[in-house]
């Protein structure tokens, strides 16, 4: 965790906050995650054969993800060495690359569209917007459920789309960042429990849980800080209290932390029963004593807390770099 790495990260956080993921750019050139997906698909097509025993598919999945992580870390090392010889230009280029793998503005923009969709197009407008950021069946969602889904996505993706990549870059530079993004992409592609990926994707899912563990815990402190800025000391305290009390109510070992913190910050019930692909997932409500009916104004409040948390993180990174 060198001074240079932290300064690059601070600049990257500013770039991502201001620029985000411009559609005009990624409409012309492929996003780096596209290449991660192609690499994962290559190994999936060649190693994940249906005629193999479950144990063989699990072993091949372990080999595949270890190779993918090694390749991505090696490529990150090469890029860092290249940027290092370019002086100030390399410093800027590395910051831009790091910003590409952060999701502050793009996440807030997507979630804000849900509130806008509800206000401009009613329930159908909200359902259409939220379907772009969550996997649950939008037709089963009423307006409060649409709002809850948007806020849950905001909280969860703050952890694995902002805090986690920033954490792994701070700890291990470009090799750590690229390896994390490869792992995160693999988890989304092959880490689910469908018959095809239950065994082949086992290692990717477990490693992703492990890699996101530090960020999930850090995220509750940042969300609490964001709540302090925008909603006061009581909301900040509730964010921590609910996170520590209710994180285990979520089926994910990591997502429950930021979601519970956001639920406490907004005095709102989150999670609970929902439907994915026609299958009902029965879970208790996080922050049961909180308000039961979420509104588009709660989405706005969640975004304010989110941006407050991002600001605190950027300030903390810069402060550590300057010590």
Swiss-Prot record:
Main location: membrane
Any one Gene Ontology molecular-function term assigned to this protein's record: ABC-type vitamin B12 transporter activity
Gene Ontology annotations of biological process type: cobalamin biosynthetic process; porphyrin-containing compound biosynthetic process
Transmembrane segments: 5-25, 59-79, 82-102, 158-178, 210-230, 303-323
InterPro entries, per the entry: Cobalamin_biosynth_CobD/CbiB (IPR004485)
Highest taxon of source: Bacteria
GO cellular component: plasma membrane
Pathway participation: Cofactor biosynthesis; adenosylcobalamin biosynthesis
Membrane topology label: Multi-pass membrane protein
Pfam families, per database record: CobD_Cbib
Location relative to the cell: Cell membrane
This protein's UniProt keywords: Cell membrane, Cobalamin biosynthesis, Membrane, Porphyrin biosynthesis, Transmembrane, Transmembrane helix
Role, per record: Converts cobyric acid to cobinamide by the addition of aminopropanol on the F carboxylic group.
Family to which the UniProt record says this protein belongs: Belongs to the CobD/CbiB family.
Name the record gives this protein: Cobalamin biosynthesis protein CobD
Source species: Sinorhizobium sp
Gene name per UniProt: cobD
